[in-house]
């Protein structure tokens, strides 16, 4: 009588779960709280990124830890408190980015294999946390969407850096795509033009001209080859053409300079002061480089720069809201996402 001996081979791996696609919207970041401690934690992470401050040598580290993190957080905390969403206990940037993700998900319709999420490069929810969460939900393909219309190494590139740091630690990595900058995308330019015209139509005064203010950066970064300035110029040129306005009726400036190095010029605050001194009495400012309202738009422009304008002779000032989670703003993101998801849906 023969005996059948069982053969013990390697365990058979379970069948793979249905593949899902993750879409991750990413913006710059925000403190978890508007007190000095929360702002200090945020600034330490932000200013320790070599993409943001390229010279991370001993002098910078001494200045950061010995001076900046002991003086700047208290001042910036007061600024955050002016714009803080106290109902949700979070910054407007977090509120708006969440809404953008939720509305984008709804706009994409019933696609059970598609998951939309959002993250911040600095602060929370972190890129690491949300990428790991998407992978845990079965996402084998991931589209990262830096919410910066204009590319810069200090914004878009550092998002990619951090995403790859997270993937480097995963055995089963998702396939990764990153959306490109959309600084002259027709949907983006159309949305900006429509938003500007709609806001101006709601005013009780007519601005004499519009200032398009972009976040600044050190001139040295541009000299090293960063395309950011050229893309800002391209955005304003396309917007002028779309709106049919002359160059001197839609000016390009740069805000938020920090430290003692030369930054991109002309500076927004100096330009606004000069315009008021020259007799401009009614002014509008739009911030095309920001996909969502944040400290730099709601406090720096809408409050600080408004005060500068009024103190030097201005009479009427308006800060035009960013596209935010408006229908047009979400449509810009939706079109960008669908274009980059081709072959995955």
From Swiss-Prot:
- Spell out the Gene3D superfamilies in the cross-references: 3.40.50.1400
Pfam families linked: Ferrochelatase (PF00762)
Q: Is Membrane given among the entry's keywords?
A: no
Q: Which GO terms describe its cellular component?
A: cytoplasm
Localization terms from the record: Cytoplasm
Task: Cite the GO molecular-function annotations of the record.
Answer: ferrochelatase activity; metal ion binding
Fetch the SUPFAM superfamilies from UniProt.
Chelatase
Q: What class of enzyme is it?
A: lyase
Which reaction equation describes what this protein catalyses?
A: heme b + 2 H(+) = protoporphyrin IX + Fe(2+)
What InterPro entries has UniProt attached to this entry? Ferrochelatase, Ferrochelatase_AS, Ferrochelatase_C, Ferrochelatase_N
Which family does the record assign? Belongs to the ferrochelatase family.
Which HAMAP family does the record associate with it? Ferrochelatase (MF_00323)
Which NCBIfam families does the record associate with it? hemH (TIGR00109)
Put simply, this protein is called Ferrochelatase
Q: Which organism is it from?
A: Rhodopseudomonas palustris (strain ATCC BAA-98 / CGA009)
Give the organism's phylogenetic lineage.
Bacteria, Pseudomonadati, Pseudomonadota, Alphaproteobacteria, Hyphomicrobiales
Query: Could you tell me the gene encoding this protein?
Result: hemH
């Amino acid at each position: 009588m023969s005996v059948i001996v069982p053969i013990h081979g390697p365990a058979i791996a379970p069948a793979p779960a249905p593949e899902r696609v993750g879409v991750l919207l990413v913006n710059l970041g925000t403190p978890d709280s508007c007190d000095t401690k929360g702002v200090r934690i945020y600034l330490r992470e932000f200013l320790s990124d070599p993409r943001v401050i390229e010279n991370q040598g001993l002098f910078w580290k001494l200045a950061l830890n010995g001076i900046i993190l002991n003086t700047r957080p208290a001042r910036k905390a007061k600024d955050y408190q002016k714009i803080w969403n106290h109902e949700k206990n979070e910054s407007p940037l977090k509120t708006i980015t969440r809404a953008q993700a939720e509305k984008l998900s709804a706009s994409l319709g019933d696609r059970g294999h598609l998951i939309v999420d959002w993250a911040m490069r600095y602060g929370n929810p972190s890129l690491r946390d949300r990428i790991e969460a998407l992978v845990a939900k079965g996402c084998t393909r991931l589209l990262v969407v830096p919410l910066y219309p204009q590319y810069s190494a200090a914004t878009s590139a550092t998002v990619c850096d951090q995403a790859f740091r997270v993937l480097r630690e995963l055995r089963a990595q998702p396939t990764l795509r990153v959306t490109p900058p959309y600084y002259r995308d027709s949907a983006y330019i159309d949305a900006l033009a429509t938003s500007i015209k709609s806001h101006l139509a709601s005013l009780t005064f007519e601005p004499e001209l519009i200032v398009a203010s972009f976040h600044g950066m050190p001139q040295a970064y541009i000299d090293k080859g960063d395309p950011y300035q050229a893309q800002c110029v391209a955005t304003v040129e396309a917007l002028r053409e779309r709106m049919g306005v002359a160059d001197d009726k839609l000016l390009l400036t740069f805000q938020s300079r920090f430290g003692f190095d030369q930054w991109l010029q002309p500076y927004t605050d100096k330009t606004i002061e000069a315009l008021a001194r020259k007799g401009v009495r009614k002014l509008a400012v739009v911030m095309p480089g920001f996909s969502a309202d944040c400290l730099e738009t709601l406090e720096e422009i809408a409050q600080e720069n408004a005060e500068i304008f009024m103190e030097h002779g201005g009479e009427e000032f308006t800060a035009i809201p960013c596209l935010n989670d408006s229908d047009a703003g979400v449509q810009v993101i939706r079109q960008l996402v669908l274009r980059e998801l081709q072959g995955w849906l």
